[in-house]
Structures are given as structure tokens and as C-alpha cells.
Amino acid sequence: MQRSKLKEVRGTKDLLGAEFYKFQYIQHLSQAIANRYGFIAVDTPIIEFTEVFTKTLGDDSDIVTKEMYNFQDKSGENITLRPEFTSAIVRLLINKNLVTPVKLFSSGPVFRYERPQKCRQRQFHQVNFEFFGSDSPLADVEMIALGYNILSELKLLNNITLEINFLGDKETMNSYRLSLVEYLNKYKKDLSGDSQRRLITNPLRVLDSKSPEDCEILLNAPNIGDFYTKYSSDFFTEVLDGLNDLCIPYQLNNRIVRGLDYYCNTVFEFTTSELGSQNAVIAGGRYDGLVRSMGGNDTPAVGFAMGIERVSALIDYEHKESRNVVLVPIGKDAMSYALKLAYELRCKGISVGWNYKNTGLKNMLRKINDNSIVLIFGDEELKSNTVQVKDMKTGEQQEVEKGNLLDALYNKI
């Protein structure tokens, strides 16, 4: 293999040391909080049949047209590395005939072929939350509250804004779509190429454009709130009232539509100004028609995903290493005893390391970090059934009988 290929693929990143522990902390904290809200953890493969995503994300979405990693396997099946979780979780819900209402938590890597930049990679990681089986506005409020709860415990609320919009029911969206198309057609030649295409295939997606020329045109675009039916207006009012009751601050943003076709009614993002253009830390909304569109029952649903890389870039986290035990056997017989002692201590839940070679006491101690507890033993200790316990942090050393060793270590770890 060429040396140039022996490195990370562009848009991917190795995780180790402090960064790995930060990722693990975010994931574990998110799952622990999800447990309080009644979620159960599930896992799906990172590969799915391509149809799982093309059938749900929208033929004109950026993910389907530009970003999915597709390939044919050796049997000729069209396979895709998952670009998002929700479609795969819905597939699981249908395949396993899960009884609703049910709340599902998942996490792991997702893959999109995008131009790598700060907080945007081709392989990145998400924690994902899906609530199937409730059409109540209060379910939307609770999901937003869950995201807010997680960001609060990550100590990020000072840097975060909750932005929310309401796309409405079918009647609302159809009326608004006609008005938006009528408005945008006046400026069709001035729109970006992507927006000209979306104007034909999915006009609401134009609202999602970050192009400066599009943003200028959209300043005077119709407001979807002017087209709400009574159902839509009442639903959104109840969502906002719920957020007010929980003292969760928010900003209305009628430009939020989300980039996937399955969203309806409530859509929201938790954003920050500290990550440049990749400003959404959490994003989600309601997708009541998705389960039915994939062949399942008519099942209302609401959910969101949180980007671990983006959260990791915002938080300060110092992993606290637990103190480990290092064996320093002196002599051949002590080496044999070390193998047995290491096994016994590990079976009792203690982290143990040793060198497997006798390179001299001073030399071995020099290579041990200050957070360790060292067990030194040679011929004399083997005869008296004792161990010398040295605390590298304090320099204190004491002789401990083998029968009291566990208690001595538990007191120091």
C-alpha cells in the first residue's frame, strides 16, 4: 500500500485520549437523561438498503442528490451508509412490530459526502431521539425540553438559542406553497441555481437556502403563519404555551423548514454563534407521515438529533483518570506471582498493569506516572505473604499483608 494512503480518509477523524473521553461523556450523559424521559436504547446497522433513505428523505434533498455513500454489494444489492438515523429507526419500528407509544434512543456514526470544514465531517456522530405514537403538542414540548435539559447539563445554555417554526398541516402547507411559488417566480432569474431547481421540485426548501442572493429575496417572502388553519394555529399555540410554562426561551424563525422532506408541523433547532456556518447543535421536529410512507401504520412521531462533534467543540471537559495499580515484581518467582496477582485484582474490578520484564526497581519506578499505586514484591515479600504498597502521588510506602491488600487499595483508588 502506498504511504500516502496510510492516513485518515478526508473528512474522517481518529478519536483517542481526551477527545475520545469527551465524546463518550456526551453520549453517556445524553443517554442517562433520555432514560429519565422513558427512552429505551436501540441500535441499527450503519448500512441499509438505499431505498430506506431515497423513499423518505426526498428525491431533491441534498442528502439524496449529493451526499449519500452508495454502493452495490457482491450480490448486486444497492446499499447506503446511513446518512441519518430517523429513516433507519422507522424501518426498525416497522420490522420489529414495536408497540406504540414508544421512545427510542440511538447513537453512532453517520456518513455524508460533504466538503469538510469546521464541525462538518464526512463521518460524524449523533445521539438521536425518536418518540412514536403521540400527536399531542405536549409531546413536542417534552422533546424540546429533553434537548434543553441535555444542553443545560452540558453547561451550554449561555451560548445557545432555541429557534422554532411551525410548518402546519397539509392545508396550511399547500396554501403557503402556492403563495411562496407565486412570490419567488417574480425573482426566478435572480435565485441561485439550487433554489431555481428547488422552486420546481420542492419550493419550501428554498427557505433553507444560505445563498446571499436568496436570503435577500426571502426577506419579503410570505410568512407561513398567515396561512395557518385553526388546527395549525391551535397546535402551535399549545407548543409555545408549553415552552413558556417550562420557562424555556425561544425565538420564532419562519425560515426553518429542515432539509428533509418528511418534516411537518413543529420544526426546531438549537443554534450557536460560535461554530460559524455549522450553527445547529440540535435539530428536529415532527414527522407524522413518515412511518406510513415506509409501509407501516399511520403513526405520529417527533424527534431530534444532536451532533456530538459540534457539542464537543463547545464544552470544556476534563476526564478524571481513576488511579491504576502497577505491579513491580523483583525476581523470577515474583514474576510468576505477578501474573496471578494481576488476574485476581482485575477480577475484583481493579485496573492493573505491569511490565512483564524485570528491568530493575529504580528503572521501573521511573516509568510509572504519579497517579499510580505501585505494588512492589520480591523474595522476602513472597515468604512473608506481604506486599510493599507505594503511593506515587504522596511518596508514602507501607508493608501490607496479602489478606488486607484489597482494603488498602480500595482506600486509595
Swiss-Prot record:
Residues spanning the signal sequence: none
Cytoplasm listed as a keyword: yes
This protein's GO CC annotations: cytoplasm
Enzyme Commission identifier(s): 6.1.1.21
Gene Ontology molecular function terms on file: ATP binding; histidine-tRNA ligase activity
Reaction equations catalysed: tRNA(His) + L-histidine + ATP = L-histidyl-tRNA(His) + AMP + diphosphate + H(+)
Gene3D superfamilies: Anticodon-binding domain, Bira Bifunctional Protein, Domain 2
Recorded family membership: Belongs to the class-II aminoacyl-tRNA synthetase family.
Subunit structure: Homodimer.
Annotated protein name in UniProt: Histidine--tRNA ligase
Source organism (scientific name): Ehrlichia canis (strain Jake)
Encoding gene per record: hisS
